[in-house]
From Swiss-Prot:
The gene is leuB. The keyword Amino-acid biosynthesis applies. SUPFAM superfamilies: Isocitrate/Isopropylmalate dehydrogenase-like. Belongs to the isocitrate and isopropylmalate dehydrogenases family. LeuB type 1 subfamily. It is found in: Cytoplasm. It catalyses: (2R,3S)-3-isopropylmalate + NAD(+) = 4-methyl-2-oxopentanoate + CO2 + NADH. This is 3-isopropylmalate dehydrogenase. The record marks Y142, K187 as: Important for catalysis.
């Protein structure tokens, strides 16, 4: 298979972890006889500094013409600390999602046995946690009509039937591939938009008779995720709720540096770690590259290259078992490994496998 990959390293630690993801992808492609080419493009604060736009048209063209985007992270404190800034790095991420029609964010939540002690939850609660959060990405309050003056402000949580149907279809199909349990998260007791979500989900559920579908208010779901994370298999929800719940779910594993994600939809899919740009660690060779590397595994799996994805996951598991880890997840007496060293260890493992 031939892969044409757009690489958007972004800001902060992005360029460092991006290199590790590319190196792993190249090693796997060589191992399995695939051809791969990369085209690099700017985004985020880096793009604002260079051209004044966090997602310039040239970057969009690169992404649009690729088979997949390997994205790292955007964000810079100089924008976070300036409330008057009209253009911000995160706007580039929203623009990419909108322009590429990326309406579904797929975020796995799982634990690694050797790192269960890193979770803030008790081991017996998280040891069997393995679920997927599916978040609608291009509708709701983040994209609805907005207004603000000195005395009032509002954001509109606007959704249409086609927007809801397409994300629910993704969720039901994921549930069919897994343990056949789907939880639809909403606030239907208060919000009209949530009542439409629930109505449409109830209409679609009979088309998937093998899937057990249940419905949960978002506040209850937030509690259930902490009290009994193993209850969930596939969870689907709207944009704002999903933004909050996916971050809550990310702490279950014990480190945001372990979790990848995918955003899919009408055009080129995007694969990225869930963590941010961590500008304080830029250039220090301490950032955990595993989420970026596991994003490459998700990329291969998206294209039905299951053996390739499985090999990457096996290599990551082996690195953790051998205590080849960056500082934030290393054992007390473990050797010191940096971003580059962890990435190279995984590349070497893949080549020898």
């Amino acid at each position: 298979m031939d892969f044409k990959i757009a690489v958007l390293a972004g800001d902060g630690i992005g360029p460092e972890i991006s290199v590790q993801g590319v190196d792993v992808m190249s090693a796997v492609c060589e191992k399995f006889g695939h051809k791969v080419s990369y085209e690099y493009a700017i985004c985020g604060a880096d793009a604002i500094d260079k051209v004044g736009d966090p997602f310039p048209e040239e970057t969009y063209e690169v992404c649009k013409n690729a088979d997949a985007v390997l994205f790292s992270a955007v964000g810079d404190p100089k924008f976070d600390n300036d409330p008057t800034a009209k253009v911000r790095p995160e706007q580039g991420l929203l623009a990419m999602r909108k322009k590429l029609g990326l309406f579904a964010n797929i975020r796995p939540v799982q634990t690694f046995k050797c790192l269960i002690h890193k979770s803030p939850l008790r081991a017996e609660l998280v040891e069997n946690a393995d679920f997927i959060c599916i978040r609608e990405l291009t509708g709701g309050m983040y994209f609805g009509e907005k207004y603000q003056d000195n005395d009032k402000a509002y954001d509109t949580n606007y959704y249409t039937r086609p927007e809801i149907e397409r994300i629910l279809k993704v969720a039901f199909e994921y549930a069919m591939k897994r343990r056949k349990h789907l939880t639809v998260v909403d606030k239907a007791n208060v919000l009209a938009s949530s009542r439409l979500w629930r109505q449409i989900a109830q209409e679609m559920a009979p088309n998937y008779p093998e899937v057990t579908t249940d419905y949960m208010f978002v506040d209850n779901a937030a509690m259930k995720m902490i009290q009994e994370p193993a209850f969930f298999d596939v969870m689907v929800t709207e944009n704002t709720f999903g933004d909050i719940l996916t971050d809550e779910g990310s702490v279950i594993s014990g480190s945001m540096g372990l979790l990848p994600s995918a955003s899919t939809g009408e055009s080129t899919p995007v694969f990225e770690p869930i963590h941010g740009s961590w500008p304080q660690a830029k250039g220090l060779n301490i950032a955990n590259p595993l989420a970026q590397i596991l994003s490459v595994a998700m990329l291969f799996e998206y294209f039905d290259c299951k053996e390739e994805g499985a090999l990457i996951r096996k290599a990551v598991d082996a690195s953790l078992d051998e205590n080849v880890r960056t500082p934030e997840i290393q054992v007390a007496d473990g050797a010191k490994y940096g971003t580059k060293e962890v990435g190279q260890w995984i590349v070497d493992y893949i080549k020898k496998a």
